C-alpha cells in the first residue's frame, strides 16, 4: 500500500525475550528500538510501549503510560509474535475438547505410532492439546458400490461417497452441554473424510455455536487436506491457540484510541505472508516470529547479492534457525512444533538446539554442546545468577564478547555487567574434567588451556549448526558453497565466519539491522490471502477445464479478500498451485506453473505437468512416466504488494575507520590483537581486515583472521571469507576433533537416509521410513548409523564383514553388492542391503564402505508381502541373495537381479516378486544413497587426509566403547554397593514355548561383560528363528539405551562384551531356517530379556503385530503399536512402537482411499497395561472391515505369554486376534495364520500392553524424587526450547 504522507509505519517483532520495533517515520527516516517483552513493573504490553516511546521521541511530547495512544499519526502496524509459539510450548492455551468420529477417540494420542527418541526407554507421553474427547455418531466412507449401499453423494474432491451414518445431533447436544458446564468453551471438530464431505462438521459446528461455544475449529475449514491425523492436530492447535491470540489482539487494541479502527494492523503468518488481525489464527501463527527473518533476508540479501541463493542463519539464545531462499519461499505443508504436527503452509525453517545459551559438557571423551539450555533464567554463568557454562561463556572467555558493550542488566538485582570471571570459573570446572581424561584416559595426551577448551566447544557448536545447513543443501542436491550466508539474530555474528568457512561459502552478508531483521522483514512483507480446496482428479486433458474452473474460483476469492482490505486490482497478483503426486504413491508436491506457461496440452493456468516432472526430477532424481498423475489439492495464493520502500541512506566514509579500542581475542593460533569498531561510525567503502570486532547496540560481529569485511552502499556488512586452510589434525586422538568428526560421520549417515527417502518409490521406505543407512570402516566395523530402525543396527556390519570375507580380492571399483541372506548378516529377506565398497587413489583395497538397508514390500514367497506366518524354510520367504553384484563395473545389472527376484516362482507354492518395478526403483534409490555417502566421505578425506579420517573412525569406535564400559562399571558398582552379585540373568518364552535365556557376568575392573544365551531354545520348525545378527542388533540397541545419553552408535558399543550364542539355537539357526518372524518378533523378546536382566524396565508389548493383506489387485502391510513397559520413575506409554521398530502407520483416510477396507476402530485398549507403582502402557484395538475378498496374514506374539512386570509390577495383557465373519461368527485366529476374508468380515486386533513396574499398592513418588534405580539416568522428558529472538 502507498505510504500516507506524515504518518508512522511500525513493524514489531515480539519475541520470547525481547521485542524489536522498526519504525519508518514521517519523512522516510528509520528509528529502531529494543525492549524486554515482559516487564510488568513498567508496562503492560511491549509492542504498545515501543510505539509509545518512538512517538514520544519523534513528536517531542510526553505520552503517559497507560493512556490510549492517539492513532491519527499511525498509518500501519505490522507484527510478528511468539504469543502462539509460547502458548504451545508452555501449554498455556485455551481449554479444548476434541469431537471425533466414533471409534477414533485416541487417534491423535496414537498419531503415527512412532516414538520421538529411539533410545529413550521412558517414552514421553504425547502432548495432546485437548482436555476431553467426545465421539460423534457419524460415518462417511468412499463409495464402492457394495450390495446394500445407499445412493452415493459427491464430495468436493469429486469422489463418490457413502453416508453410512448421518450425524446424530440430538445425542450430541447433551454431551456438548456437559462440556459447557465444565468450563470448556473451545472445540476442535475432526471427522473422517471431512476434507471432501464437510457437511457433518458444519452441522456439528452450527449446533455448538448455538449452544454458546465461543470458538469452534472445523478441520475441514482450518486445513481441508486429506490425512485426518495431521489435520486433526492442526484443528486442535487452532482451537487451542486462536482464542489466546484473539485475546492478545483485543488487549493490544485497547492500548489505542478507537481500538485501531482507522489503522491497518497486520500480523505475520507462518507462511511468510501478512494477514489482517481479525483473520490471524492459531494454526497459522506458530512460526510468526521466525518467518519475519526469512522475509527480511529474502527482501534484502538475496537482491543485494545479485540473486545468489541465500542460507539464513538466525542464532538465538537456545536454538538456531536455518532456512534457504533462492528466489521463492520454500514451504512445507506438514511440520512439527513443540510436539504438535501442523498441516498448514509454513516456511521451511530448520531448528537445531544449539544457541548462545546451549550448555557445555564433557562426556566420555567428547565435547558436547546442548541440547540442554540455560534459558533466560538463570541464563549463562556470565549472567551472575549461578547459571551453567554455555556457548556464550566460551565466547566471553575467548574475548569475542565485550562486557562493556552490554547494558548492566545482569545479576540478582539486574544492575550489573556481564561477568567474565563467572564464565572462567564455570569453564574451569569443565576443563578439569577434560584434562583429567587427557591425563588418565586410554590415550594420554598433553593438557589443554582454558582457552583451548573454550575454543573446542565453539568449534563443536559450529559443526552442530552446520548439520541442518547441509541437510537443507547437500541432501537436496544443492551445493552449500554456492550460497551466501545471511546472518542475523543476536548471537550469529560471533559464529558466521566459521560456519561459512566450514561450508565452503565465500560471502557472509550481515544487514545493518541484523539484530532485528525479523522486524525489518515485517516492514518489507506483502499481505497474503490464500484459498485452497481438496481435489481428486487425474491430471489429464479431460480434467483441465475442471481444474481451470476451480482455480479461477479460488483466484476470485483471493482478489475479493484483498480488495476488501483496500488493495486496488493493480497491486494484487495471484499464483496458482496444484498438489500433485504419482498415482499409488504418497509423496505429493505443491507445484506452481509460473515458470511453465500454458500450452495446447495444459490447463489455461499453466503447464503444471511439466513443472511437476521438473520438480520431481530435481527433488528425487527420477520420474515415473508410466504412472498417472493425481491432483490432491488446488490452491491459489493472492498477494497484495505493500512492502515499504526504505530510504535510510548510510553515510559515506570520509576517512579511515575509527578504531574504538584494541582488545585480545583468542583464535586457533593463540591470542591476537583485535581492533574494535562501532558499526554506527562506519561508512560506505570502509574495509576492515580480520581479526576485528564490529559492535552495535544489538549484536557483535566477529571478523576472523583471513577474512575481510566491507561496508556496502546500503550500510550492510559484507564479509569475504578466506578459504579454509588444510587441516592441521593428525591421527592422534584429540577430544575436540573427535567431537567434530562425530558430527560429520553422523551427518553422512543422516544425509544418506534423506537421499534414500527422497529417491525411493515404495510406501515402506518413503513414508513408513523402514530403512537404515550407515558408514563402515575398512574392516567392515560400523562407524556411524543414523538412528533409523533399531533391528538393523548391529546386523548391517555383520553383512559388510561377511562380504569382505566372502569376496576377498574380488571387489573392484564400480561394484555394488546386494545381500539379504540371514547367514550373511541379514535380518529377514525383505530387508535388502546394498553395500558399496569405496576405493581411494593409491589404495588396493576399499578404504571404507557405505550401506543402506530397506524393507521391500514384496520379494516373492508363499504369501503377498513376503511375511508368511507359517513358513518353515527360507526359500518360502522370497528371493535370496547371499552375495550378488547389483552393479558391476558401474553397470546396473537389471536383467540378472530381475531374474533373481522372479526365481522364487520356480518353487512349488511360491511366487516371484509381485512388484518388480518398485523393487528395482528402490534398489536404485539405495545405490544413489550410497553414492551420496561416498561423495561426502570423499570430501571429508579431501579435507583431512585418508590417514586422519580412518584414524578417527577408530577413535569414534573407541569412544563408544568407553561409554559402554562406563555404564557397565556404574551398573556393577551399584549392585556391589547394595550387596548384590555381579551376575544377572533373565528368561522369557516365545508363544510356542521356546525359551530365551540370558546370563550376564560383569567384570567391574575392566568394565566388560559376558552375555551368555546358553539355554535358549533350539531352532524351530517355523519362522521364529533369529539370525545371529538380530541378537547383536538387539544387544547394541539395549546397550545404547542403558548408556542413557547420546553417544556415537557404532561397533565400539559391542567391544566391551563377549556374546555366547549356541549354534543351532533359535538365536543362531541353520542357514536354510525360516527367519521372518525372528526379525519382527524374536528380536523384541531378546530385548525384553536383556533389559529385564538389568532391571531397566518392564517388558514392552514384545511384538510388532504384523498384518498383511493382499489379492491379485493390491497388497498392504503394516505393523501396529502396543504398550511400552514402565520403569523406575515413569509410566509406560500407550499406543506406541517400542524397541526394535519405529515405523509409522498409514493415515486412516489414506488407508480407506487406497485399499478395500474400512477402519472401524483405532483406539487404546484400556486396562491392558500392567498395574504397578508405575503402570505399563496400554495396547490398541484396531478393527478392519473388508470390502473385497483377500488373503489376510497375521504374524504376532505375546498371545500366550504376558509381558512381564518388574519389582512387583503386574504383567501386561496378552494380545488377541479375532475374525468376525459377516454372519456373526467370531473366530480366534491365534498368533500366526493366513485366512481368506470376504466383504463384511471384520478383523479385530487387540495388541498387548506393557508390564507394570513396582508394587501397585505403593504410591508413585512425587515429581523430582531420585530415581529408584540409580545405575542409569532418569530420562524421558521431551525438552522444548523457546526460540530466543535475541541473546548475548
From Swiss-Prot:
One of its GO terms (biological process) is glutathione metabolic process. The keyword NADP does not apply. It comes from the Eukaryota. Residues 1248-1270 are annotated as: Disordered. It catalyses: 5-oxo-L-proline + ATP + 2 H2O = L-glutamate + ADP + phosphate + H(+). InterPro entries: ACX-like_C, Hydant_A_N, Hydantoinase_A, Hydantoinase_B, Oxoprolinase-like. Keywords: ATP-binding, Cytoplasm, Hydrolase, Nucleotide-binding, Phosphoprotein. GO terms for cellular component: cytosol. The modification Phosphoserine is found at residue 1265. It holds the Pfam family Hydant_A_C. It is found in: Cytoplasm, Cytosol. PANTHER family: 5-OXOPROLINASE, 5-OXOPROLINASE RELATED. Belongs to the oxoprolinase family. This is 5-oxoprolinase. It comes from Rattus norvegicus.
Amino acid at each position: 500500500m502507498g505510504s500516507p504522507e506524515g504518518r508512522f509505519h511500525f513493524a514489531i517483532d515480539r519475541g520470547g525475550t525481547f521485542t524489536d520495533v522498526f519504525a519508518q517515520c514521517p519523512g522516510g527516516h528509520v528509528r529502531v528500538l529494543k525492549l524486554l517483552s515482559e516487564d510488568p513493573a513498567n508496562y503492560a504490553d511491549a509492542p504498545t510501549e515501543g510505539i509509545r516511546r518512538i512517538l514520544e521521541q519523534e513528536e517531542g511530547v510526553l505520552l503517559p503510560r497507560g493512556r490510549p495512544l492517539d492513532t491519527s499519526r499511525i498509518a500501519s502496524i505490522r507484527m510478528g509474535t511468539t504469543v502462539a509459539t509460547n502458548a504451545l510450548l508452555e501449554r498455556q492455551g485455551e481449554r479444548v475438547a476434541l469431537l471425533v468420529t466414533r471409534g477414533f477417540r485416541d487417534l491423535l494420542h496414537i498419531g503415527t505410532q512412532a516414538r520421538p527418541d529411539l533410545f529413550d526407554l521412558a517414552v514421553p507421553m504425547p502432548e495432546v492439546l485437548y482436555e476431553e474427547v467426545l465421539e460423534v455418531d457419524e460415518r462417511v466412507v468412499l463409495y464402492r458400490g457394495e450390495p446394500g449401499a445407499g445412493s452415493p453423494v459427491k464430495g468436493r474432491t469429486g469422489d463418490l461417497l457413502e453416508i453410512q451414518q448421518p450425524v446424530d445431533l440430538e445425542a450430541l447436544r447433551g454431551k456438548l452441554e456437559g462440556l459447557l458446564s465444565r468450563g470448556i468453551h473451545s472445540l476442535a471438530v475432526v471427522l473422517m473424510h471431512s476434507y471432501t464431505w464437510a457437511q457433518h462438521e458444519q452441522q456439528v459446528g452450527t449446533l455448538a455455536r448455538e449452544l454458546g461455544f465461543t470458538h469452534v475449529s472445523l478441520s475441514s475449514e482450518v486445513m481441508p487436506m486429506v490425512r485426518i491425523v495431521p489435520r486433526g492436530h492442526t484443528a486442535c492447535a487452532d482451537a487451542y491457540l486462536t482464542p489466546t491470540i484473539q485475546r492478545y489482539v483485543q488487549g493490544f487494541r485497547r492500548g489505542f484510541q478507537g481500538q485501531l479502527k482507522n489503522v491497518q494492523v497486520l500480523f505475520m503468518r507462518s507462511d511468510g505472508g501478512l494477514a489482517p488481525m481479525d483473520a490471524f489464527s492459531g494454526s497459522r501463527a506458530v512460526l510468526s516470529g521466525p518467518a519475519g527473518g526469512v522475509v527480511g533476508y529474502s527482501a534484502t540479501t538475496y537482491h543485494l547479492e545479485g540473486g545468489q541463493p541465500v542460507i539464513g542463519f538466525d542464532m538465538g539464545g537456545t536454538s538456531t534457525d536455518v532456512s534457504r531462499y533462492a528466489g521463492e519461499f520454500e514451504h512445507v505443508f506438514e511440520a512439527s512444533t513443540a510436539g504438535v504436527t501442523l498441516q498448514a503452509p509454513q516456511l521451511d525453517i530448520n531448528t537445531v538446539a544449539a544457541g548462545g545459551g546451549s550448555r557445555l559438557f564433557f562426556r566420555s571423551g567428547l565435547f558436547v554442546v546442548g541440547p540442554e539450555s540455560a534459558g533466560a533464567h538463570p541464563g549463562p554463568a556470565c549472567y551472575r545468577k549461578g547459571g551453567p557454562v554455555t556457548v556464550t561463556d566460551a565466547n566471553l572467555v575467548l574475548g569475542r564478547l565485550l562486557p562493556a558493550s552490554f547494558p548492566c542488566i545482569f545479576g540478582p538485582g539486574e544492575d550489573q555487567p556481564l561477568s567474565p570471571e563467572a564464565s572462567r570459573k564455570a569453564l574451569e570446572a569443565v576443563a578439569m574434567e577434560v584434562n583429567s581424561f587427557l591425563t588418565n584416559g586410554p590415550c594420554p595426551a598433553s593438557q589443554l588451556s582454558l582457552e583451548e577448551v573454550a575454543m573446542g566447544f565453539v568449534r563443536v557448536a559450529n559443526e552442530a549448526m552446520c548439520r541442518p545447513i547441509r541437510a537443507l543443501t547437500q541432501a537436496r542436491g544443492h551445493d552449500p558453497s554456492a550460497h551466501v550466508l545471511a546472518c542475523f539474530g543476536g548471537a550469529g555474528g560471533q559464529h558466521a565466519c566459521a560456519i561459512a568457512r566450514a561450508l565452503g561459502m565465500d560471502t557472509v552478508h550481515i544487514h545493518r539491522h541484523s539484530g532485528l531483521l525479523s522486524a525489518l522483514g515485517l516492514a518489507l512483507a506483502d499481505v497474503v490471502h490464500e484459498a485452497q480446496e481438496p481435489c481428486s482428479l487425474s491430471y489429464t486433458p479431460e480434467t483441465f477445464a475442471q481444474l481451470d474452473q476451480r482455480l479461477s474460483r479460488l483466484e476470485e476469492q483471493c482478489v475479493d479478500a484483498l480488495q476488501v482490505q483496500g488493495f486496488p486490482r493493480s497491486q494484487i497478483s495471484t499464483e496458482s498451485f496444484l498438489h500433485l503426486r504419482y498415482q499409488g504413491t504418497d509423496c505429493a508436491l505443491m507445484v506452481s506453473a509460473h515458470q511453465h506457461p500454458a500450452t495446447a496440452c495444459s490447463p489455461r493456468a499453466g503447464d503444471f505437468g511439466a513443472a511437476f516432472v521438473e520438480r520431481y526430477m530435481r527433488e528425487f532424481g527420477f520420474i515415473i512416466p508410466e504412472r498417472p498423475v493425481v491432483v490432491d489439492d488446488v490452491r491459489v495464493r493472492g498477494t497484495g504488494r505493500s512492502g515499504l520502500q526504505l530510504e535510510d541512506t548510510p553515510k559515506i566514509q570520509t576517512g579511515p575507520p575509527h578504531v574504538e579500542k584494541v582488545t585480545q581475542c583468542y583464535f586457533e593460533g593463540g591470542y591476537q590483537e583485535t581492533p574494535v569498531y562501532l558499526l554506527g561510525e562506519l561508512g560506505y567503502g570502509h574495509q576492515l581486515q580480520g581479526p576485528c570486532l564490529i559492535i552495535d547496540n544489538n549484536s557483535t560481529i566477529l571478523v576472523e583472521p583471513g577474512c575481510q569485511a566491507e561496508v556496502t552502499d546500503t550500510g550492510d556488512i559484507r564479509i569475504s571469507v578466506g578459504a579454509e586452510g588444510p587441516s592441521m589434525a593428525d591421527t592422534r586422538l584429540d577430544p575436540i576433533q573427535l567431537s567434530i568428526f562425530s558430527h560429520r560421520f553422523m551427518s553422512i549417515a543422516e544425509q544418506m537416509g534423506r537421499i534414500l527417502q527422497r529417491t525411493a518409490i515404495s510406501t515402506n521406505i518413503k513414508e513408513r521410513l523402514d530403512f537404515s543407512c550407515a558408514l563402515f570402516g575398512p574392516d567392515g566395523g560400523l562407524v556411524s548409523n543414523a538412528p533409523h530402525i533399531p533391528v538393523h543396527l548391529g546386523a548391517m556390519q555383520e553383512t559388510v564383514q561377511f562380504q569382505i570375507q566372502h569376496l576377498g580380492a574380488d571387489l573392484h571399483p564400480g561394484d555394488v553388492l546386494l545381500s539379504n541372506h540371514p547367514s550373511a548378516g541379514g535380518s529377514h529377506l525383505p530387508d535388502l542391503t546394498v553395500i558399496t565398497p569405496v576405493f581411494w587413489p593409491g589404495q588396493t583395497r576399499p578404504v571404507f564402505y557405505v550401506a543402506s538397508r530397506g524393507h521391500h514390500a514384496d520379494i516373492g514367497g508363499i504369501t503377498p508381502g513376503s511375511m508368511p506366518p507359517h513358513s518353515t524354510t527360507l526359500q518360502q520367504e522370497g528371493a535370496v541373495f547371499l552375495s550378488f553384484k547389483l552393479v558391476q563395473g558401474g553397470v546396473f545389472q537389471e536383467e540378472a537381479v530381475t531374474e533373481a527376484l522372479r526365481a522364487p516362482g520356480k518353487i512349488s507354492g511360491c511366487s516371484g516378486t509381485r512388484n518388480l518395478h518398485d523393487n528395482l526403483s528402490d534398489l536404485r534409490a539405495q545405490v544413489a544413497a550410497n553414492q551420496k555417502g561416498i561423495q561426502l566421505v570423499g570430501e571429508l578425506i579431501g579435507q583431512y587426509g585418508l590417514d586422519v579420517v580412518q584414524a578417527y573412525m577408530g577413535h569414534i569406535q573407541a569412544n563408544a566403547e568407553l561409554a559402554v564400559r562406563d555404564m557397565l562399571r556404574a551398573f556393577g558398582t551399584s549392585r556391589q554397593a547394595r550387596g548384590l552379585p555381579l551376575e544377572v540373568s533373565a528368561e522369557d518364552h516365545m508363544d510356542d514355548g521356546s525359551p530365551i535365556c540370558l546370563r550376564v557376568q560383569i567384570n567391574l575392573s575392566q568394565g566388560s561383560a559376558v552375555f551368555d544365551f546358553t539355554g535358549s531354545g533350539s531352532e524351530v520348525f517355523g519362522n521364529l528363528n533369529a539370525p545371529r545378527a538380530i541378537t547383536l542388533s538387539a544387544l547394541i540397541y539395549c546397550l545404547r539405551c542403558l548408556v542413557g545419553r547420546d553417544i556415537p552408535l557404532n561397533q565400539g558399543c559391542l567391544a566391551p562384551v563377549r556374546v555366547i550364542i549356541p549354534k543351532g539355537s533359535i538365536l543362531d539357526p541353520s542357514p536354510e531356517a525360516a527367519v521372518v518372524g525372528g526379525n519382527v518378533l524374536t528380536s523384541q523378546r531378546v530385548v525384553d530379556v536383556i533389559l529385564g536382566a538389568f532391571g531397566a524396565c518392564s517388558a514392552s508389548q514384545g511384538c510388532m503385530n504384523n498384518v498383511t493383506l493382499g489379492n491379485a489387485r493390491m497388497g498392504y502391510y503394516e505393523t501396529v503399536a502396543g504398550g511400552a513397559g514402565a520403569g523406575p520413575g515413569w509410566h509406560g506409554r500407550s499406543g506406541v512402537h517400542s524397541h526394535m521398530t519405529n515405523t509409522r502407520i498409514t493415515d486412516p483416510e489414506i488407508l480407506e482411499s487406497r485399499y478395500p477396507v474400512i477402519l472401524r476402530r483405532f483406539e487404546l485398549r484400556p486396562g491392558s497395561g500392567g498395574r504397578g507403582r508405575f503402570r505399563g502402557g496400554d495396547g490398541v484395538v484396531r478393527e478392519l472391515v473388508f470390502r473385497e475378498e483377500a488373503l489376510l496374514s497375521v504374524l504376532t506374539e505375546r498371545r500366550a505369554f504376558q509381558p512381564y512386570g518388574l519389582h512387583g509390577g503386574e504383567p501386561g495383557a496378552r494380545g488377541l486376534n479375532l475374525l468376525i465373519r459377516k454372519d456373526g461368527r467370531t473366530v480366534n485366529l491365534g498368533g500366526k495364520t493366513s485366512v481368506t476374508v470376504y466383504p463384511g468380515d471384520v478383523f479385530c486386533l487387540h495388541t498387548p500392553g506393557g508390564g507394570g513396574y513396582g508394587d501397585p499398592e505403593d504410591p508413585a513418588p512425587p515429581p523430582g524424587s531420585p530415581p529408584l534405580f540409580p545405575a542409569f539416568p532418569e530420562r524421558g522428558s521431551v525438552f522444548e526450547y523457546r526460540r530466543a529472538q535475541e541473546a548475548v
